[in-house]
């Protein structure tokens, strides 16, 4: 737990506290760095998918430029995102947490509530945030207790 907590502390790009991100990572991958490798489209600790990575790369450009990107800039951002997604960098724990939390922050910035942001982040899983929130609240009181994750989210 201490190692994942330190990784989250150093790489979280969202406004969400580290306990929320730790619970989210556990729910997504059970802390398995190579989750999804050669199995499906969701990859790494935060189970990032290609379109999510593309959205982050495009959003980065919008923030840098202070405006919407042109079609050419969007295509360049998508090409860079695809290169990242297809590389082993997607499985680097630090990079995966950075891009996953950037993606979460994108939705936090777009949606009216944190709950809606998590719902949009996850897609159709209505219960996603309702599982993460109570787990994170318990973990905040006992930060090194992995049992909280196992009981709150599952094995």
Pin down the residues of each PLM region.
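Residue-level detector of well-ordered alpha-helical segments, enriched
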Residues: 16-21, 41-44, 113, 117
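Non-catalytic cell-wall polysaccharide-engagement segments
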Residues: 1-13, 32, 54-155
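A mature extracytoplasmic/lumenal domain signature
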Residues: 41, 50-52, 121
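Glycine-centered small-residue hotspots that permit tight backbone geometry or close packing
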Residues: 44-47, 72-73
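Short secondary-structure boundary/capping segments within folded domains
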Residues: 12-15, 37
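Short amphipathic alpha-helical segments at helix boundaries and their inter-helical linkers
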Residues: 29-42
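Short, functionally critical alpha-helical segments immediately adjacent to catalytic or ligand/cofactor-binding
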Residues: 15-32, 48, 100
């Amino acid at each position: 737990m201490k190692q994942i907590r330190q990784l989250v502390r150093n790489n979280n790009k969202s406004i969400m506290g580290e306990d929320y991100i730790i619970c989210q990572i556990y729910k997504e991958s059970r802390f398995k760095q190579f989750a999804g490798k050669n199995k499906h489209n969701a990859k790494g600790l935060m189970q990032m998918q290609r379109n999510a990575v593309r959205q982050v790369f495009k959003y980065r450009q919008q923030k840098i430029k202070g405006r919407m990107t042109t079609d050419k800039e969007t295509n360049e951002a998508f090409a860079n995102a695809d290169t990242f997604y297809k590389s082993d960098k997607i499985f680097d724990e630090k990079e995966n947490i950075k891009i996953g939390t950037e993606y979460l922050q994108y939705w936090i910035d777009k949606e009216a509530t944190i709950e809606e942001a998590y719902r949009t982040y996850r897609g159709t899983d209505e219960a996603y945030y309702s599982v993460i929130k109570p787990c994170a609240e318990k973990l905040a009181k006992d930060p090194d207790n992995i049992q909280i994750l196992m009981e709150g989210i599952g094995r």
